[in-house]
């Protein structure tokens, strides 16, 4: 097992095979932050849709971003982004990051999060776990491809279909 701590940090690099958590709970109930950008500018958003798995021989994360989300422009402009996971004490911070736009306010400051940069990509010191992700593929959800048509009606009344991003998890950081 690989474990190397980052200098000046409580975060250690872990082998992804050593992870032991339920992704359905971690993403769907506890939520995650999708963050992209660098020191010159970044943004973050809360997400409760996503997935983890293996594709093309790589450990991957899948995330979904609607076109109107400010974070999307940062994800689109960069090759990498981070997914970060938090304990219950940070639920309010994730609520702020999910309900306010970085276009209109400094929601990172308002949420009490402290940015740092790993491999040139923004993440937050308060996270218990961070995945550094390198984009491999993206596509738009298309209405004509719904087999279960009720999902189109239920989740897309405004027809603001998500972009799907599949990204290789290149680094896993875990709070020690």
State where each predicted segment sits:
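Active-site-proximal mixed secondary-structure blocks
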Residues: 14-47, 51-176
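Single conserved hydrophobic/aromatic residue that forms the stacking wall/gate
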Residues: 1-13
């Amino acid at each position: 097992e690989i474990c190397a701590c980052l200098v000046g940090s409580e975060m250690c690099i872990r082998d992804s095979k050593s992870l032991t958590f339920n992704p359905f709970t971690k993403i769907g109930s506890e939520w995650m932050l999708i963050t992209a950008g660098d020191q010159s500018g970044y943004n973050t958003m809360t997400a409760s849709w996503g997935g983890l798995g293996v594709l093309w021989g790589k450990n991957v994360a899948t995330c979904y971003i609607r076109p109107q989300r400010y974070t999307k422009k940062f994800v689109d402009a960069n090759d990498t982004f981070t997914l970060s996971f938090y304990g219950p004490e940070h639920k309010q911070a994730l609520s702020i990051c999910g309900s306010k736009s970085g276009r209109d306010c400094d929601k990172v400051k308002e949420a009490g999060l402290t940015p740092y940069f790993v491999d040139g990509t923004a993440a937050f010191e308060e996270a218990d776990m961070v995945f550094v992700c390198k984009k491999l593929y993206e596509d738009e959800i298309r209405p004509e491809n719904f087999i279960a048509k009720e999902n189109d009606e239920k989740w897309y009344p405004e027809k603001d279909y998500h972009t799907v991003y599949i990204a290789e998890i290149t680094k896993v950081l875990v709070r020690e």
